[in-house]
Design a protein with these regions (language model features):
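Nucleic-acid endonuclease domains
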Residues: 1-75, 80-144
């Protein structure tokens, strides 16, 4: 799965990212000395994959706090975007650490996208599923 962020419904994409960035910025614990602009840029980068899945694949927002999306089968999925293949193991380790903190209610399904900040090109790296120890690659495609 490949897409370019310019294909997204701009109004939906920007409003969604601005809402989350505002929420992050509103608390010292999540703001962490970052400017609103910095938080917005980071949020836009990550939200492109989420907006695409909503717009093109029929996914919906998971309205619970700090959760990403609900897939077409009604399952909660976590969406992560990173800059290159070299960074995927680190993304998986962070997700595994979060999953082991059971109070978080971290989803069993994780999608990792590679996003190019300069070109706005995104590509699915993989769909990973929790096996009670770690996230394991299930597929390089999303079935819709």
């Amino acid at each position: 799965m490949k897409f370019n962020a310019t294909e997204l419904n701009r109004e939906f994409y920007l409003n969604r990212a601005e809402n989350e960035a505002s929420e992050i910025y509103s608390k010292d614990s999540t703001r962490r000395n970052r400017t609103f602009q910095n938080i917005l840029e980071t949020t836009l980068y990550g939200h492109a994959a989420e907006a695409y899945l909503i717009q093109e694949c029929g996914y919906s927002d998971d309205d619970r706090k700090y959760k990403d999306l609900i897939d077409i089968k009604g399952r909660s999925v976590e969406i992560k975007v990173t800059e290159g293949e070299y960074y995927v193991p680190y993304v998986l380790k962070r997700a595994e650490k979060a999953k082991l903190q059971t109070w978080r209610g971290y989803p069993d399904i994780l999608y990792v996208f590679i996003g190019n900040r300069k070109t706005a090109d995104y590509e699915l790296n993989g769909v990973y599923k929790w096996n009670n120890e770690r996230f394991v690659l299930q597929s390089n495609e999303i079935s819709v």
